[in-house]
Amino acid sequence: MKGLPALLLLLIGCVSSFGSQDVPLRVLAEKLNIHIGFAAGNNFWSLPDAEKYMEVAKREFNILTPGNQMKWDTIHPERNRYNFEPAEKHVEFALKNDMIVHGHTLVWHNQLPGWLTGQEWSKEELLNILEDHVKTVVSHFRGRVKIWDVVNEAVSDSGTYRESIWYRTIGPEYIEKALIWAKEADPDAILIYNDYNIEEINAKSNFVYNMIKNLREKGVPIDGIGFQMHIDYRGINYESFKKNLERFAELGLQIYITEMDRGFPLGGSVGYYLKKQAEVYRRIFEICLDNPAVRAIQFWGFTDKYSWVPGFFKGYGKALIFDENYNPKPCYFAIRELMEEKLKER
């Protein structure tokens, strides 16, 4: 693969420091007319190493997703009370540092407050609650949040609607209604559907494709598709991924890579896995940069120090592009090298 000799040299020391002569990813991304970003951790401004965290974030990225601060349990903790303060801090940091904000998420089956899940609702009651939530949150951030994950993970791995509180009580039309309400609250926002395990052509991505196709044929305002891309350490079928992006693009959708990471087993050869990780990230970026429908590529975090992977997948980790000490990893350099090559081709 093109670029691997340089990559192998980088692997000799496993990591390298970022030098003043090096071009940050966001600068290259802007020249390529794409956004590159990350999901910001909870209260990152209060971390013991907050200064370093923010220094790297604003240097490298031009799009930010609040990881948890816009989810129901945080932003709507009581039926008649909204708490915007945690999310506001993320938005303020992003806008101050010339990043756009990707809102996450308006409708999901997880991280719901007890007042919502602790009792039964009629269809009409739940529709009213959902409408109030979507319109209130989107209106609050109107003009400041450019992209919204309106509906998140509404489809099961088997390719059917997920049996969530929304689907059981309202039916599949909750997806359509949430999109319509979001567009009413901010006509200029980019509205997307976001999900995992849909990067390749499979039963789940087929269902999502047909669902979105039907929504667009009905005139429902859906602008894009979000591929989370929490990638298995063995990688993905690149040809299937490429064709999948192409068919969603043919629907007229903008494409967003929203939550990417790629961990690996911690008990094996670190050098080998770092090399494979760099190869996988480079190939994914190459496919994305070759598709003009892809508007942003975001990681679920950026430093291994605060990655979610070790806490959820025992024995796995090192999923992101900076190590625990904020040193750029081989995958960082592989991505940067590819972006530089793409610029030379233009």
UniProtKB/Swiss-Prot annotation:
SMART domains from the xrefs? Glyco_10 (SM00633)
- Pfam families per UniProt: Glyco_hydro_10
Q: Which UniProt keywords apply?
A: Carbohydrate metabolism, Glycosidase, Hydrolase, Polysaccharide degradation, Signal, Xylan degradation
Family membership, please give it.
Answer: Belongs to the glycosyl hydrolase 10 (cellulase F) family.
Molecular function in Gene Ontology: endo-1,4-beta-xylanase activity
Taxonomic source organism: Thermotoga neapolitana
Q: What is its EC number?
A: 3.2.1.8
**Stored PROSITE patterns:** GH10_2
Asked if Secreted is a keyword of the record, the answer is no
Gene3D superfamilies xref list: Glycosidases
**Active-site residues, Swiss-Prot/TrEMBL:** 153, 259
Q: Name one GO biological process term.
A: xylan catabolic process
**What's the name of the protein?**
Endo-1,4-beta-xylanase B
User: Known catalysed reaction(s)?
Assistant: Endohydrolysis of (1->4)-beta-D-xylosidic linkages in xylans
- GH10 domain location is 41-338
Tell me which positions the record assigns to the signal sequence. 1-19
In terms of superkingdom, the source organism counts as Bacteria
